[in-house]
């Protein structure tokens, strides 16, 4: 997946072929506008107003309690982006958008789009981070309201990757106990437990995260098969030979290498013989010449707001070996920012 400039005629195609303008120039201009347009339309319920059918600009203005001329400008921007289309004097939501953009859509990303407002603010720290190397350490500074937006954003659209992980994870049929470190909204645990009826999961999470994630988990009606335990992954007692599976989704990019190595040792001790640890993470390319757009951006983003950044498959495999675990071949999702499932197995 890559963000780029799409030429609309022959002269534009020729200009791009000649490197006019060079990469990044147009993207930095159009990207900021396009992003804010979708964010505003989501926050102001423009998309929701069209859930029941096409409306005129005046009708949308009335439903959303917005300014008439400014609303029409926003609507036309959305048409230009392909997010809406015009039907006579009315604006309509394309069928392909409904499942993704509406609050009750099957793959709704509404919560994730609203999270962009927090991320917009976080990116203002980019220059300071590059100058000093000091990250934001967001998990230490998020307000109560921010935690709610953050958890809803993390939950939005996670069904596809969670179900993919549940299908691809080589979980032993005898597995009964799972530890989900930093599992937040809990849907990875939900997907795995639904696929493996004998499995029960404990989600180890910070108390401030649980406060806002628990209502999201309750909607899945998993009863006592998926439960929360308050604690910090870096200091909590993980036990000895207690779990058949220890799972972490988008966790290790928060920690530096020394911390991840130490955490992996503690996870190894907590695994039963034959048990597995699974890490689902965006992958950093091993060779600088092979860095792709989204991979490079994600590495900077995670470094900016947390402690470290993304890791390569070779680095994660080395953590496994250092902890006495046998690395399995990583499995990369066909869709997304090089999202990869890394598995290490404890000898039986």
Question: What residues fall within each predicted segment?
Answer:
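Short, hinge-like loop/turn segments at secondary-structure boundaries
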Residues: 219-222, 294-298, 347
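C-terminal alpha-helical "lid/dimerization" subdomain adjacent to the S-adenosyl-L-methionine
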Residues: 280-323
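Compositionally biased, charge-rich terminal segments
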Residues: 1-15, 285
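Conserved adenosyl
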Residues: 106-280, 284-289, 337-340
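Core SAM-dependent methyltransferase catalytic element
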Residues: 324-348
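Conserved Class I S-adenosyl-L-methionine-dependent methyltransferase catalytic core
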Residues: 11-16, 20-54, 62-65, 69-176
């Amino acid at each position: 997946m890559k963000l780029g400039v799409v030429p609309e005629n022959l002269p534009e195609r020729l200009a791009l072929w000649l490197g006019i303008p060079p990469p990044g120039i147009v993207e930095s201009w159009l990207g900021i506008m396009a992003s804010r347009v979708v964010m505003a339309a989501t926050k102001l319920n423009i998309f929701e107003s069209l859930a029941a059918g096409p409306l005129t600009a005046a009708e949308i203005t009335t439903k959303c309690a917005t300014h008439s001329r400014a609303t029409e400008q926003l609507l036309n921007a959305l048409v230009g982006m392909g997010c809406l289309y015009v039907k006579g004097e009315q604006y309509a939501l394309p069928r392909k958008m409904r499942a993704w953009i509406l609050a009750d859509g099957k793959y709704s990303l509404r919560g994730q789009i609203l999270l962009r407002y927090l991320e917009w603010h976080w990116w203002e720290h980019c220059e300071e981070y590059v100058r000093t190397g000091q990250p934001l350490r967001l998990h230490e500074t998020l307000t109560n309201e921010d935690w709610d937006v953050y958890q809803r954003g993390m939950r939005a659209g996670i069904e596809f990757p969670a179900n993919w992980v549940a299908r691809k994870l080589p979980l032993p049929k005898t597995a009964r106990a799972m530890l989900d470190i930093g599992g937040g909204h809990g849907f990875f645990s939900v997907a795995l437990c639904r696929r493996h009826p004998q499995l029960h999961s404990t989600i180890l999470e910070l108390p401030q995260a649980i406060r806002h994630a628990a209502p999201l988990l309750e909607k899945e009606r998993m009863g006592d098969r998926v439960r929360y335990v308050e604690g910090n992954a870096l200091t909590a007692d993980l036990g000895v030979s207690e779990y058949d599976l220890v799972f972490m989704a988008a966790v290790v990019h928060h920690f530096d290498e020394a911390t991840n190595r130490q955490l992996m040792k503690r996870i190894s001790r907590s695994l039963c013989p034959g048990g597995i640890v699974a890490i689902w993470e965006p992958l950093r390319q091993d060779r600088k010449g092979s860095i792709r757009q989204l991979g490079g951006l994600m590495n900077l983003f995670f470094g900016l707001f947390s402690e470290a950044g993304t890791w390569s498959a070779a680095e994660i495999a080395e953590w496994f070996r250092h902890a006495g675990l046998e690395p399995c071949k990583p499995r990369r999702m066909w869709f997304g920012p090089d999202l990869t499932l890394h598995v290490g197995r404890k000898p039986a």
